[in-house]
Amino acid sequence: MSTAQPFTRHDVSFTSGEDTCAGWLYLPTGVASPPAVILGHGLGGTREMRLDAFAERFAQAGIAALAFTYRHFGDSGGQPRQLLSIKRQLADWDAAIAWVKARGDLDAARIAIWGSSFGGGHSITVASRHPELRAAVAQCPFTDGLASALALGPSASLKVLPTVARDFASIVGRRAPTMIPLAGPPGSPALMNAPDALPGYEALLPTGTTFRNEVAARVAPTIMAYRPGRVAKKIKFPILFCVSNTDSVTPPAQTLRYAHTAPRGEIKRYDAGHFDFYLGEAFEALVRDQVEFLTRQLNSALPQDQSSDVRSH
């Protein structure tokens, strides 16, 4: 039976644009120049919402882990607060990669990325733009905004339009953004309103959190237009897709279609809901598969032989 590697956690920050992203860097003790994995969360999520649980397991496997919070959220910089900009979040990923590469205590030639939900979509996009990376993990990934909107139904999309219109008016009038809930009960005008969305989101919040369940409504149209799954076919290195068979937020059928286009993709499927991935038995099964994948892809200093890739269903 393997013994978990001890690690230390450090509060860090890095520059992105004119602001800073806050993060936690997990360093495995006694490992010289370890490989690294960068973790980013989903829609409005911050690193306190269980990214630490994944990062700890990776560090225990001898892999350094950087879990960061996007600008405009949590303790990262950026004004106005609660602004979700896909362009800026992708720039945060670029900045995180550059920061890891520049550190002398990490192996710049062995870097992976890990994203969950909306961040899983970002990991697909970022992987397609950074061929120098070694591996990627896309956990219950958001792959197609149109498919997600259709899964919710047209009435749900229509309910958010008045709030979106008011937020765009606030831009013109230079007023504070008009907010919309990230997660809400079924039928509510929220970005996620599946039956498990609100309780699932709240289950990820640590005690005493100051997390705000809201985001500037102007993001809604850009989410619908965001289809990161389309670039999966451009990813040159191994990527692991962890797919929920009962996902209420990111339709699994569409995710699987895109995952099959990744030349070196691996697929793992789970009978657990979108928000179940972060806790309990589902988390244990998931993180075990992810540790195996990342260890396999990052431990060798030489490029993996493409013929050794495994596609599991």
Q: What are the functions of these language-model segments?
A:
Residues 124-204:
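Alpha/beta-hydrolase-fold enzymes
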Residues 1-32:
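N-terminal cap/lid segment of alpha/beta-hydrolase-fold proteins
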Residues 44-56, 70, 253:
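The serine-hydrolase catalytic nucleophile loop
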Residues 271-313:
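Catalytic active-site module of serine/aspartate enzymes centered on a nucleophile-bearing elbow/loop
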Residues 235, 241-243:
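Short beta-strand/loop motif that positions the catalytic acidic residue
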Residues 17, 47-50, 73-108, 112, ...:
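Catalytic nucleophile-loop/oxyanion-hole region of alpha/beta-hydrolase
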Residues 57-77:
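Conserved alpha/beta-hydrolase
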Residues 248-254:
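Conserved alpha/beta-hydrolase "acid-adjacent" motif
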